[in-house]
Every structure is written in C-alpha cells, then in structure tokens.
UniProtKB/Swiss-Prot annotation:
It comes from the Eukaryota. This is Citrate synthase-related protein DDB_G0287281. Belongs to the citrate synthase family. GO terms for cellular component: mitochondrial matrix. GO terms for biological process: carbohydrate metabolic process; propionate metabolic process, methylcitrate cycle; tricarboxylic acid cycle. Residues 286-309 have a biased composition (Low complexity). InterPro entries: Citrate_synth-like_lrg_a-sub, Citrate_synth-like_sm_a-sub, Citrate_synthase, Citrate_synthase_sf. It comes from Dictyostelium discoideum. Residues 284-317 are annotated as: Disordered. One of its GO terms (molecular function) is 2-methylcitrate synthase activity.
Length: 417
C-alpha cells in the first residue's frame, strides 16, 4: 500500500485538501464543490459544478427494492449499519463495471446516502414513507435538513405523501453550519483508521462498494476521526450547568475514565466549527427569547423582570457554555484539546438533528474522501499489508486432550438467544 498521497495534508498550520486551506474552503466554498475537488483533483468550473450537482441530485431517488430493504431494518439498528447495508445492497443491483465505474458509484452513494438515512429513520420511527426528492436548486446541506424535517406530522397530507411545497425552509445558518461540518469531515488523511481501511481494501483490487463498506464499519468505532460526535453528545447532555460539568468531568478524570472528543494534538478544524456552534447558540437564544416575549405580552413588569433573569440563567447553562467549560477543564487538567467531533456534536444538536444520527453524518461526508483515496490507491500500487511482531509462545508439542489442564473459564453461548 502506498505511503504517498496528494489528497490531504495535515500540519500545525492547517489542513489542506488538494493544496487548498480548509479555512478558505469552509468560508467560501460548498460541500459539493469540495467533494468534486477531492474526487476529481481540481476545483470545478461553473459548468462542471452545475453538472456535478445535477448528478448528485439525480441519485436522491432510491429504488423501490432498496426501500423494501430499509423498511425491514428495525429502529434499534445503528444508522451506520443502515448505510453499510445500503452500500452492500447497491453492490448487488448495480455492481462496479466499465460502464458503472467508480465515479458514477461515488455520485450514487454520496447523492443517495441522506435519502437512505432519512427514509429508514422516519419509517422505523413512525411508519412514514417520505419522498426523498426536494427542490432541484437545494444544496446538499439544505436537502439534508429538509429530509430531516419531513418526519413532522404537520408536513404529511392525507395520502401519507409529501410535496416539496410543504417543506419547512431550514434556517440559513443551520444550512451553512451543516455545510461547514460536511466540509470539515470530508477528509483527514490516511492517519484515520477508516481511510487506512479503504486504502488497504483498494490495494487488494477489491470493488469500490467493498472498500467503502470496510470504511463505514471502521467509522462506527468511537476512536476513529468522525465517529465520536454521538458519544460526545451523550457525555454533554446530562450536564445541567458549568458547575455540574466541573463535578462530572473531574470525577471521570479522577476515575481514569476516557473522555471522548479530546486529543493530545490541536485539531485545526475545531476553531472553525466552534465558531459556528457559538453562532447557532446565539440564534437559538434569540428565537427562545422572542417566543418568551410573545408568551409574556400580558404579564406585568415584575413578571417580565423575572423572566429576563430566567433567560440570563438559561444562557449561563446553555449547551455552548457547558461545552466551553468542559473544554477548559480538559485543557487545564490534562492539557488535551477538543477535536472536531466535540463541537460538531453541539452544532448538530442545536440544529435539531437527533443524536442517533450524528455519526452517520460523518460517514456521508467522509465518503468523498474515501472515494478519492480509493482512486489514488488503485493508481499507485498493489496489495501491501502492515507487518506484525509475533509475541506468542515458542514452539510447543501438541498435548493429548486427556492430558490438558483446564484453566479457561469457557462457556458455550446459549443458541436460543
């Protein structure tokens, strides 16, 4: 397996996709444009970007046969397993070939993964079969958030069908924050386990679906880059205040418990997504204040003053404030830094995305980087496996079964479970 790549550079200054700084890409680009850059090696022209977006939009539709599969997956399944199942299913109905090459397959998977995720999520949650098509001009991020909101009962007509006119328009800042998250998750070099996995699979000559399936399975682990945002939210959600965070984090530190969302090295992506987390916190606070003001129009001045004090208290105990306190404690005590998963979790939560789906978002975004790495690996080398140092026993003679000493606590599993 090759140890050279032109796709992603991670250093102390920043992270670069094909030479472009992610600070610039998140400020002025879009996920679709970055996806094209990673897979095709250059930024698209205006015409190329229009055609690429059209190709991704084409695959928002998912075939009826796949819908039947998704409807059989139970609600307690992990969303990452849902995407992996869909990927494997596509390999059976549309296998890789000269006509159906890696570029077409990449468009299919990237374009259809949000549709797959939300078709399964809404059906398994409340039996709703959503229409996975949205407006032609909807960006990838806007399309994603519209599908998320299609599970609301208020959006369903009598025939249990959706029309695009009924979609609730997502808040612009939510769309941009998700777009930035997708860009930041799109690639992070071969140092990540999921990218190493896809390149290793590609080096064997395996088909693209198998390479992506391998990476998806690896991403399910909370220790892989992008796989821990879900665990971060489960850590933060029970914390009611910065003081509560102090107690719980210090208890975990004293008990030598692993705290997800932190690493020894500074993550250049964290300040970018943290800033968006702050913006969403302000927007949500203002929306809540407006709702409170509307509800309190008939209250007297004394009650209004009490409500204002309550709003200040809520601000002190907001998810953003608690998150920043946890980050502060972790650096002061352990000298570790919050990684991109930490504040992506707060961005997703403030955008009303269910915690269960957090890790699946990183899979959808990282598919672009995996595809780029598969293409590059295929061009560079054949199979090459990492070596291991054997630490087992020296050669020993075979012991007859009646002479063996029992020392294992071995139990045969109950086959009825």
């Amino acid at each position: 397996m090759s140890n050279e790549s032109k796709i992603c550079l991670v250093n102390e200054d920043s992270i670069y996709y094909r030479g472009y700084d992610i600070k610039d890409l998140t400020a002025v680009s879009s996920f679709e444009e970055v996806s094209f850059l990673l897979i095709y090696g250059e930024l698209p022209t205006e015409r190329e970007l229009i055609e690429y977006r059209s190709e991704l939009q084409h695959y928002r539709y998912i075939p009826e046969s796949l819908k039947q599969v998704l409807e059989r997956i139970p609600i307690y399944a992990h969303p990452i397993d849902v995407l992996k199942t869909a990927c494997s299913f596509y390999s059976t109905i549309s296998p890789e070939s000269k006509q159906n090459d890696i570029y077409r397959i990449s468009n299919r998977l990237i374009g259809s993964f949000p549709s797959i995720l939300f078709y399964w999520y809404h059906f398994s949650s409340n039996g709703i079969r959503i229409n996975t098509l949205t407006e032609v001009n909807d960006s990838f991020a806007r399309h994603f958030l519209k599908l998320l909101n299609r599970g609301n009962n208020n959006n369903i007509n009598n025939n249990n069908k959706f029309t695009t006119e009924q979609d609730e328009e997502p808040i612009l800042e939510y769309v941009k924050a998700l777009d930035v998250s997708l860009i930041l998750y799109a690639e992070h070099g071969i140092e990540t386990a999921s990218t190493f996995s896809c390149r290793l699979s590609a080096s064997t000559g395996s088909d693209v679906y198998s390479c992506i399936g391998s990476s998806i399975g690896t991403m399910k682990g909370v220790l892989d880059d992008g796989g821990s945002s879900e665990a971060v939210m489960y850590l933060l959600q029970p914390m009611k205040s910065p003081e509560d965070a102090d107690k719980k984090i210090m208890k975990m530190i004293n008990n030598n418990q692993r705290i997800i969302g932190f690493s020894n090295e500074f993550d250049q992506r964290t300040p970018i997504i943290k800033e968006w987390s702050k913006q969403l916190s302000i927007i949500n606070k203002n929306n809540n204040n407006n709702n409170n003001n509307n509800n309190n129009n008939n209250n007297n001045n004394n009650n209004n003053n009490n409500n204002n004090n309550s709003e200040d208290d809520d601000d002190d105990n907001s998810l953003q404030t608690i998150s920043e306190r946890v980050e502060e404690i972790m650096f002061d005590v352990l000298k570790v830094h919050a990684n991109v998963d930490f504040y992506n979790a707060t961005v997703f939560h403030q955008s009303n995305i269910p915690t269960l789906l957090f890790s699946a978002i990183s899979v959808i975004a990282r598919t672009t980087g995996w595809m780029a790495n598969i293409i590059e690996q295929r061009c560079q080398s054949k199979n090459s496996l990492p070596s291991l140092i054997y630490t087992g026993s020296d050669p020993i003679p075979f012991t007859p079964i009646n002479e063996r000493v029992y020392y294992h606590n071995f139990k045969i599993p109950n086959s009825n479970l």
